[in-house]
């Protein structure tokens, strides 16, 4: 912990992370060159990140590029979360009321918020209550004409049993919307503040319906965000143009290019040569290079995330919690901290990060005791155990090097006589294959843009999350689920804390997954990039990003104008 604080201080001083979704259409560029770099340093910046894009609609994404990078650029939500105070703040809803002891929520919408004008849609009206009703009815109403479009899967909200929880969402007038729940839910506002809850254009949906092109709603996005989609080249880059009608004011940069074309050391090389202006999720092993280069800056924030190893609890012998405990004892977590995170993470004792208000301070990190592992396996009569470990290939905010992590776990288990076969998987392919339940172990993680513990518990480990394809452990415990429901129904923070701590003790005993690390969020960027905000909950808007020379030029022009006014 001390080393972690020292690293945070040093970086602060230097600077003062497609089967269910059909293939995406690739919008043609509008009056722009097909190569992303020629004029970008004068008219925008390049953001380098790894990831696979399966949808532009955050409602249909489970994590990754859409949530971590694109959502805050293309869309807005009813509510936001302040990245510094962790409190809810107004967004498209300028105010709200909690009624009926948390069973009714009424939102008063902003007026004069325009939707983006794109090559595929020109709006004729501003955002209103019809758009909010459309956006949420599509998710929870199975009879809605857009519910089944592009697969009908909404992983985050499905994991929360959103369709079973919401009784209705109604337009009271053009700028007032009311949600009625079937039971009080203290976490409801927090879920609406996540990037999974964008407001879509109902008018755009109507136009697509008339054209018979409904599937384009998730492929050619229209939102109210600061940037709009101009061009997408699969596996190469995404170009965004600023929204000249953005309701918060004109974004500073005319365009942003999101470079998808390189990973690992390739992205670092691009940053060092100036081909990238911002490097998302640099590997912790690259920190010394980044810190020592005077042309670069680093930002670091605590992250609301967890990396974990999930056990397929429906597959023998992992359906026996004693086997899961034995495997956990054989993993050298301190070596993971040193070899993967280089001091940029805390060893996790719970799926909740330590920053969570419901974190159980009595939680203990699983000890490293391979001899005890051998004894347990011998007692159970288990020999020559072979396991398949499914591993995502792309770096994530919670794990910068998944494949290397898997190799270290493989080596640890080999020491206790367990053979591990590493199976690399990517994107939605990973989710689809995991739902076949043919895996034994999977290395994964979770990050959230909510400060409510429910954003970790239900998506990862509720019974409903098995169907929504986010519960990779395939673990279902009625007692655990009941504790989560009690926490949701309570409006008393102390009671919610107690329920969530009881839930954490069940997880410690049953161990459907092994928490590994809660990682700090890292971002590296060129010295002349200013206004870049790194949030614990995911990426913030790029609307305020600018180059230092642009500011100097603006000040110079203003000075010249002032000089001209002098007598």
Give the role of each language-model region:
Residues 31, 38, 337, 415-430, ...:
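Extracytoplasmic/peripheral linker and loop segments enriched in polar/acidic and small residues
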Residues 94-146, 178, 270, 317:
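Aromatic- and charge-enriched surface segment that lines or borders ligand/interaction sites
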Residues 108, 131, 140-141, 145-205:
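Surface-exposed binding/hinge segments that line
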Residues 82-83, 174-175, 185-251, 255, ...:
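Gly/Pro-rich hinge or "lid" segments in bacterial periplasmic/extracellular proteins
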Residues 26, 234, 378-450, 493, ...:
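Ligand/substrate-recognition segments at binding pockets and active sites
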Residues 239-242, 318-411, 415, 476, ...:
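Append "and occasionally in soluble cytosolic enzymes with long acidic Gly/Pro-rich linkers
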Residues 212-218, 243-289, 406, 419:
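Ligand-site clamp/hinge motif
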Residues 33, 46-101, 137, 144, ...:
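N-terminal lobe/hinge region of extracytoplasmic solute-binding protein
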């Amino acid at each position: 912990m001390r080393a972690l604080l020292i690293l945070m201080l040093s970086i602060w001083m230097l600077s003062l992370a497609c089967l269910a979704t059909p293939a995406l259409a690739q919008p043609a560029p509008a009056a722009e060159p097909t190569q992303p770099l020629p004029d970008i340093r004068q008219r925008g910046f390049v953001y380098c990140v790894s990831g696979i894009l399966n949808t532009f609609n955050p409602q249909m994404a489970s994590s990754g590029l859409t949530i971590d990078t694109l959502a805050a650029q293309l869309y807005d939500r009813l509510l936001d979360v302040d990245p510094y105070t962790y409190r809810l703040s107004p967004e498209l809803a300028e105010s709200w009321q909690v009624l009926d002891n948390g069973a009714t929520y009424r939102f008063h919408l902003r007026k004069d918020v325009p939707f983006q004008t794109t090559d595929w849609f020109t709006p004729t009206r501003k955002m209103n209550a019809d758009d909010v009703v459309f956006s949420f009815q599509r998710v929870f109403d199975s009879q809605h004409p857009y519910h089944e479009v592009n697969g009908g899967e909404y992983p985050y909200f499905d994991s929360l049993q959103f369709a079973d929880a919401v009784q209705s969402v109604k337009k009271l007038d053009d700028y007032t919307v009311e949600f009625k729940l079937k039971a009080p839910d203290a976490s409801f506002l927090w879920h609406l503040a996540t990037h999974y809850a964008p407001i879509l254009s109902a008018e755009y949906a109507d136009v697509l319906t008339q054209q018979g092109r409904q599937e384009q709603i998730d492929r050619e996005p229209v939102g109210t965000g600061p940037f709009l989609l101009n061009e997408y080249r699969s596996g190469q880059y995404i170009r965004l143009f600023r929204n000249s009608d953005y309701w918060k004011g004109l974004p500073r940069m005319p365009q942003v290019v999101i470079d998808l074309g390189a990973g690992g050391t390739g992205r670092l090389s691009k940053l060092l040569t100036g081909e990238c202006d911002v490097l998302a999720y640099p590997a912790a092993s690259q920190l010394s290079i980044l810190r020592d280069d005077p042309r670069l800056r680093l930002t670091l924030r605590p992250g609301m995330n967890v990396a974990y190893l999930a056990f397929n609890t429906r597959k023998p012998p992992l359906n026996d919690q004693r086997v899961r405990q034995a495997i956990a004892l054989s993993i050298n977590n301190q070596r993971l901290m040193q070899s993967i995170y280089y001091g940029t993470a805390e060893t996790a004792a719970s799926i909740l990060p330590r920053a969570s208000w419901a974190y159980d301070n009595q939680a203990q990190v699983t000890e490293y005791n391979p001899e005890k592992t051998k004894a347990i396996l011998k007692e159970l009569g288990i020999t020559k155990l072979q396991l398949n470990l499914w591993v995502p290939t792309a770096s994530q905010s919670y794990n910068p090097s998944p494949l290397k992590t898997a190799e270290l776990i493989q080596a640890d288990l080999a020491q206790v006589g367990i053979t591990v076969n590493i199976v690399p998987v990517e994107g939605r392919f990973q989710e689809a294959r995991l739902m076949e339940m043919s895996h034994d172990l999977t290395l994964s993680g979770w990050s959230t843009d909510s400060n409510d513990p429910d954003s970790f518990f239900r998506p990862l480990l509720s019974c409903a999350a098995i169907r929504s394809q986010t519960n990779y452990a395939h673990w279902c415990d009625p007692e655990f689920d009941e504790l989560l429901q009690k926490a949701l129904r309570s409006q008393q923070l102390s009671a919610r804390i107690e329920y969530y701590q009881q839930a954490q003790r069940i997880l410690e005993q049953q161990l459907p997954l092994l928490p590994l690390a809660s990682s700090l969020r890292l971002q590296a960027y060129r010295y002349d990039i200013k206004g870049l905000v790194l949030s614990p909950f995911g990426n913030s808007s790029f609307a305020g990003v600018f180059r230092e020379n642009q500011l100097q030029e603006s000040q110079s022009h203003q000075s010249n104008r002032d000089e001209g006014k002098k007598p």
